[in-house]
């Protein structure tokens, strides 16, 4: 018979998901990639977080030999880490890491470390996500609050531990700021071809390709940097002229 135990739910999150820059620019300081600042780090809330999904993957190679119909071993050859987060943004700071062009601090040129803690069987455990870079950012709005979904590649997601290993960190508590809504930008927030256009639904996705350095002798990736950015969007707009169709036919950017 299974013994009853304390199941972890959203109420067991103690310190919400929060982050800090590892370096202002991994292009000029690549050795800082994947290194969480340990001396008096000050963390920033990752929006009004509603969901986080960790995706660790152990890469292995099957060992198959003559004389046996079964594999005789499955050898670990590497570790790959990604995670996704869903949140209601209270500002554009975290979003800019995924949306805007690389330009040093506050953009995709700067890798991040995330941390959160949760109660596991009534004991607080910390998880640190190191060397995080955004590979996909989706921002959507439908006459309510802004919703954001971000996918990140990581160098490492640590095993939950009762000690975070940081010296005098400043953590943020559960955020209480109001999320951004469809009215925060005023009336007619959407413009097409320099013309204000009424719409009721909008979504944009920015996808980034990463160049990843993985070498013999290391189980995790050594370094990663952004290489390509692709932007797409969709909008449910009310048609009041022929501009959309004309621009579509002319392939006008």
Tell me what each language-model feature is:
Residues 2-253:
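Signature of extracytoplasmic/envelope-associated structural regions
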């Amino acid at each position: 018979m299974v013994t009853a135990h304390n199941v972890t739910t959203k109420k067991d999150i103690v310190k919400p998901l929060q982050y800090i820059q590892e370096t202002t620019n991994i292009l000029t300081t690549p050795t800082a990639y994947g290194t969480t600042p340990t001396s008096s780090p000050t963390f920033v809330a990752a929006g009004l977080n509603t969901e986080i999904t960790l995706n660790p993957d152990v890469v292995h190679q099957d060992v198959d030999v003559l004389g046996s119909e079964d594999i005789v071993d499955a050898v670990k050859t590497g570790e790959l880490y990604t995670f996704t987060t869903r949140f209601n943004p209270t500002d554009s700071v975290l979003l800019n890491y995924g949306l805007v062009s690389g330009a040093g601090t506050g953009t995709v040129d700067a890798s991040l470390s995330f941390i959160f803690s949760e109660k596991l069987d009534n004991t607080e455990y910390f998880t640190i996500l190191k060397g995080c870079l955004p590979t996909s950012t989706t921002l959507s709005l439908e006459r309510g609050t802004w919703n954001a979904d971000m996918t990140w590649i990581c160098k490492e997601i640590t095993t939950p531990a009762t000690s975070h290993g940081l010296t005098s960190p400043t953590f943020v508590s559960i955020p209480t700021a109001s999320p951004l809504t469809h009215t925060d930008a005023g009336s007619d927030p959407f413009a097409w071809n320099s013309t204000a256009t009424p719409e009721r639904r909008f979504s944009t996705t920015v996808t980034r390709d990463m160049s990843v350095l993985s070498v013999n002798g290391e189980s995790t990736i050594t370094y990663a940097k952004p290489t390509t950015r692709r932007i797409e969007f969709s909008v449910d707009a009310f048609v009041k002229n022929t501009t959309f169709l004309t621009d579509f036919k002319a392939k006008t950017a």
